[in-house]
């Protein structure tokens, strides 16, 4: 496994891979890797000749400076995990390599609508940062496929739209959420949880299951369902942030013709803002 930190060296290897006709898969990450990331790697390995994992804590997508500062950085441990998984390349650039002139005045990629709705409304600028860095990685690495986790449901929808709108010839693969045995979705931010909070954390998944059962049963009193869910979360020790029930295919409000719903949940537990989602097939 080769660790690449500079753009010239990356471009050199990408040119060689293209000349050799290799099928390249990209797994973009911010590091602090867990089993969910490893599932992305496994999916990439099954679909391509060469797997490149990027590790870059992207300052452009953080809406709070304190969150950027304390985001876990575990490059050595991450590389050890990826080496065991027989990843071919790790691209781990410094911030100055990606943004040599700083963020002020940086050209950015914005995806209208999806960037500012739902999660984007509560985290201004976040998705603009995501689409910009992913676009830069696509331009640099020129992958045939790229793997993203379905845990970040809105992010995956945003990337798919960006790829379509910008005419990238890249297959976007969504990989299902990986959960702990108690249902908690794996996330780098779980590291912020204390031992006591970790015991409480699966409550978010349980509340989503309760919402799903109501939707499957035909209940469409969405505001009432959401209000009850928020109350349940607060009683469990969370601070409910945002719960939405949307059309899974458009992320717009549910209509009578919606075939699938997605429950999008975000809640604070101590210093950790946990997000999760669950899709439900609706009775027609």
Swiss-Prot record:
GO terms for cellular component: cytosol. Gene3D superfamilies: HUPs (3.40.50.620), Pantoate-beta-alanine ligase, C-terminal domain (3.30.1300.10). One of its GO terms (biological process) is pantothenate biosynthetic process. (R)-pantoate binds at residues 61, 155. Its EC number is 6.3.2.1. It comes from the Bacteria. InterPro entries: Cyt_trans-like (IPR004821), Pantoate_ligase (IPR003721), Pantoate_ligase_C (IPR042176), Rossmann-like_a/b/a_fold (IPR014729). Beta-alanine binds at residue 61. HAMAP family: PanC (MF_00158). Homodimer. Catalyzes the condensation of pantoate with beta-alanine in an ATP-dependent reaction via a pantoyl-adenylate intermediate. This is Pantothenate synthetase. It comes from Salmonella typhimurium (strain LT2 / SGSC1412 / ATCC 700720). The lineage of its organism: Bacteria, Pseudomonadati, Pseudomonadota, Gammaproteobacteria, Enterobacterales.
């Amino acid at each position: 496994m080769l660790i690449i930190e500079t753009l010239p060296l990356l471009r050199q290897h990408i040119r060689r891979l293209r000349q050799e006709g290799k099928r390249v898969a990209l797994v973009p990450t911010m590091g602090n890797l867990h089993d969910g990331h490893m599932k992305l790697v496994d999916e990439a390995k099954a679909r391509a000749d060469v797997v490149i994992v990027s590790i870059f804590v992207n300052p452009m997508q953080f809406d709070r400076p304190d969150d950027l500062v304390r985001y876990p950085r575990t490059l050595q441990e991450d590389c050890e995990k990826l080496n065991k998984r027989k990843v071919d390349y790790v691209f781990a650039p410094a911030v100055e390599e990606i943004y040599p002139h700083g963020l002020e005045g940086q050209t950015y990629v914005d995806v209208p609508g999806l960037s500012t709705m739902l999660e984007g409304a509560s985290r201004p600028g976040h998705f603009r940062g995501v689409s910009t860095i992913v676009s830069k990685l696509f331009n640099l690495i020129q992958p045939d496929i790229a793997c993203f986790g379905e845990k970040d449901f809105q992010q995956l929808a945003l990337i798919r739209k960006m790829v379509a709108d910008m005419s990238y010839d890249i297959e976007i693969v969504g990989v299902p959420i990986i959960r702990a045995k108690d249902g908690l979705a794996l996330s780098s931010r779980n590291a912020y949880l204390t031992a006591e909070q970790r015991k409480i954390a699966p409550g978010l998944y349980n509340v989503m299951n309760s919402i799903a059962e109501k939707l499957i049963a035909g209940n469409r009193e969405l505001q009432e369902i959401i209000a009850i869910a928020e109350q349940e979360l607060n009683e469990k020790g969370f601070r409910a942030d945002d719960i939405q029930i949307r059309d899974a295919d458009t992320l717009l409000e549910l209509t009578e013709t919606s075939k699938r719903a997605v429950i999008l949940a975000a809640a604070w537990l101590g210093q950790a803002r946990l997000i999760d989602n669950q899709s439900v097939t609706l009775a027609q």
